[in-house]
Curated annotation (Swiss-Prot):
GTP binds at residues 162-165, 216-224. Binds 1 zinc ion per subunit. GO terms for molecular function: GTP binding; GTPase activity; metal ion binding; rRNA binding. Residues 13-33 have a biased composition (Basic and acidic residues). The lineage of its organism: Bacteria, Pseudomonadati, Pseudomonadota, Gammaproteobacteria, Enterobacterales. The keyword Cell membrane does not apply. It is found in: Cytoplasm. It comes from Proteus mirabilis (strain HI4320). It comes from the Bacteria. This is Small ribosomal subunit biogenesis GTPase RsgA. Zn(2+) binds at residues 300, 305, 307, 313. Residues 114-276 form the CP-type G domain. The gene is rsgA. Its main location: cytoplasm.
């Protein structure tokens, strides 16, 4: 018997009921600690967040699972906080502290959600590592979508092309030519292989002293790269076997978590950055997200120029003169077209 397809309203009610059940269970497991049971306030770092609890790393590197004060409206991996440890560790109780306050963020990585608006998924990020690969398929369009997201969030990107060991000399030269497009407009690009270790030293140096997050589609080798770069851990970032037929891996991260690199710097591994939706952006924001367009903006003949076949368009003139790469220009219009096809729209405050 064919299952009846749920409407969007029904799907939303199912999702809300699911959240209520989870919250109800969390309340039953919630252990309250009063002030007499708590030590002095101290600084900490959110390593991971689980519902009403968070794992907090102290200055000595120890990790304590804590309750979160109900007055804290938003807490994500990467947040720097003030917390208080329990004076005595309680037997059979996993929660041994409480988060009291959150420091102001230097940046916040967000993603759009159809029902909940803009959702924060990580804080204090310095750079986004855009991981792409020749398998399952090298898509410059997807790279450009990530770059627009980075520019909109004002977080520096680093493009990492993985699995270059699978290219022959001719294909490698062609791919390097494509990557030169991004280098020419000021983006950093690294060609690496987690298998042969090519380019990993340069990537390691780029990660030192920064908080990074790896973004990319499933199968491009994000988890393999992280397992190569990180020290051996009891709980490693799992990587499923890649199919011999498809060349695809499977994304196995289930909760955002922060890890430390041996030479310095941190990484947040999160399931929320498999892809960045752009449907909540305006066409103007997408246009500004193509950094090589910016010198020409405001100079077109018509104020409502669509930068396509409009007469007097400085951007199309720049493409004709070779000042803007045709592939980037084509991907710009592909992104706008994909946004126009999204029928569901919600008014979202991007500053929230």
């Amino acid at each position: 018997m064919t299952k009846r397809k749920l409407s969007k309203g029904q799907q939303r009610r199912v999702q809300e009921n699911h959240k209520k059940r989870l919250q109800s269970k969390e309340k039953k497991n919630h252990v309250e600690l009063d002030d007499t049971q708590l030590g002095e306030a101290t600084e900490g770092l959110v390593i991971s967040r689980f519902g009403q609890h968070a794992d907090i790393e102290a200055a000595d590197g120890s990790i304590t699972r804590c309750n979160i004060r109900r007055t804290i409206s938003s807490l994500v991996t990467g947040d720097r906080v003030v917390w208080r440890p329990a004076l005595q560790t309680q037997e059979n109780v996993r929660v041994n502290g409480i988060v009291e306050a959150v420091h102001e963020r230097t940046s916040v990585l967000t993603r759009p959600d159809y029902y909940d608006g803009i959702k924060p998924i990580a804080a204090n990020i310095d750079q986004i590592i855009i991981v792409s690969a020749i398998l399952p398929e090298l898509s410059l369009n997807i790279i450009d979508r990530y770059l627009v997201a980075c520019e909109t969030l004002n977080i520096e990107p680093l493009i990492v092309l993985n699995k270059v060991d699978m290219l022959d000399a001719e294909s490698r030269a062609m791919v390097s030519e494509w990557m030169q497009i991004y280098k020419d407009i000021g983006y950093r690009v690294l060609e690496v292989s987690s298998y042969t270790k090519e380019g990993l030293e340069a990537l390691t140096q780029a990660l030192i002293g920064r908080i990074s997050i790896f973004a990319g589609q499933s199968g491009v080798g994000k988890s393999s790269l992280l397992n190569t770069l990180l020290p051996p851990m009891e709980e490693s970032i799992l990587v499923n076997q890649v199919s011999d037929n498809s060349g695809l891996g499977q994304h196995t991260t289930t909760a955002s978590r922060l890890y430390h690199f041996p030479l310095g710097g941190d990484v947040i591994d999160s399931p929320g950055v498999r892809e960045f939706g752009l449907w909540h952006l305006t066409p103007e924001q997408v246009t500004k997200g193509f950094i090589e367009f910016r010198p020409f903006l405001g100079g077109c003949k018509f104020r409502d120029c669509k930068h396509n076949d409009d007469p007097g368009c400085l951007i199309t003139e720049a493409v004709d003169k070779g000042e803007i790469a045709p592939t980037r220009f084509e991907n710009y219009h592909r992104i706008l077209e994909s946004m126009s096809q999204v029928k569901v729209r919600k008014n979202i405050n991007l500053d929230s």
